Curated annotation (Swiss-Prot):
Annotated GO CC locations: cytosol; mitochondrion
Origin organism lineage: Eukaryota, Metazoa, Ecdysozoa, Arthropoda, Hexapoda
Keyword set, alphabetical order: Chaperone
Domain of life: Eukaryota
Organism: Drosophila melanogaster (Fruit fly)
UniProt cross-references to Gene3D superfamilies, sorted A to Z: RutC-like (3.30.1330.40)
Family to which this protein belongs: Belongs to the RutC family.
Keyword Membrane attributed: no
NCBIfam families: Rid family detoxifying hydrolase
Descriptive protein name: RutC family protein UK114
Gene Ontology MF terms in the entry: deaminase activity; protein folding chaperone
Summary of the function given for this chain in its UniProt record: Molecular chaperone. Seems to fulfill an ATP-independent, HSP70-like function in protein folding. May protect essential factors of cell proliferation during heat shock. No role in calpain activation.
Disulfide linkage: none
Length: 138
């Protein structure tokens, strides 16, 4: 049986983890990106504003981590979005569809009681590396 290499991803181009975990882990050709918050990578503070601004920054952090893992938003197969208030669903979707604007990945969205650092939005994903072909089956 061959050994699968587990690569631990860390990039200075995204906010650092706020607890003991890696920004992402790559196993074989699959990238598991930890939850990204709307943190400024330099100050490690939540960006000013509300759910729209936090979602935008969280997605920028997610994109930076994906790039460090030799992947990208076009290779994301599953997103999970955590919201402090599900009433922010529409506002977050407006930001989300600017980043994921075609061939949408699978996605779940949950309202949660609390997020780290009192964030309003957290986004994690699973993506692929290497060459990826998309086919639509109906």
């Amino acid at each position: 049986m061959s050994t699968i290499v587990r690569k631990l991803i860390s990039t200075a181009n995204a906010a650092k983890p706020v607890a003991p975990y890696n920004q992402a882990v790559v196993a074989d050709r699959t990238v598991y990106v930890s939850g990204c918050l709307g943190l400024d990578k330099d100050t490690m503070k939540l960006v000013p504003g509300g759910p729209t601004e936090q979602a935008q920054k969280a997605l920028e952090n997610l994109e930076a981590v994906l790039k460090a893992a030799d992947s990208g938003v076009d290779k994301v197969i599953k997103n999970t979005v955590f919201l402090k208030d599900l009433n922010d669903f529409g506002a977050v979707n407006e930001v989300y569809k600017r980043v994921f604007n075609k061939d949408f990945p699978a996605r779940s969205c949950f309202q949660v009681a609390k997020l780290p650092m009192d964030a309003l939005v957290e986004i994690e994903c699973i993506a692929l590396t290497g060459s990826v072909e998309t086919k639509t089956v109906q």
